[in-house]
């Protein structure tokens, strides 16, 4: 079994994955980053940690964050983002289709970077988001 904490997939292997598969992994990576950030910097009551996490991981917030990141992405990252954004999925009632597609793009980007072993870039992009949050 591969070391799931230190992945380094090739670009080809990442590009063979489905867009929604990348978003599925990216959703978990993004939420873990948010939870870690809040535990290290925020109010430590469980109620507040949960409330603050929800405010960062919902589709509306992710859509806003995605738009803030777009100018900072290189071509490859933009392609991963577009793959997720253009994936066919159904938006929940709590988000508009546009918000949901932007959020899915952000998650696909984070999933691809994680699978590529680009934790340095994940940290850089996540830091940009939290500086503006």
Label for each model-derived stretch:
Residues 1-133:
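Double-stranded RNA-binding/processing signature
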């Amino acid at each position: 079994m591969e070391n799931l904490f230190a992945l380094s997939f090739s670009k080809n292997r990442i590009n063979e994955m489905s867009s929604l598969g990348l978003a599925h992994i990216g959703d978990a990576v993004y939420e873990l980053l948010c939870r870690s950030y809040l535990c290290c910097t925020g109010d430590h009551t469980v109620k507040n940690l949960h409330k603050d996490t929800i405010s960062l991981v919902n589709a509306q917030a992710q859509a806003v964050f995605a738009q803030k990141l777009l100018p900072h992405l290189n071509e490859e990252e933009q392609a991963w983002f577009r793959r997720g954004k253009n994936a066919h999925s159904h938006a929940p009632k709590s988000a508009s289709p546009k918000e949901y597609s932007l959020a899915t793009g952000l998650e696909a980007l984070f999933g691809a970077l994680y699978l590529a072993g680009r934790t340095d870039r994940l940290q850089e992009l996540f830091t940009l988001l939290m500086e503006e949050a």
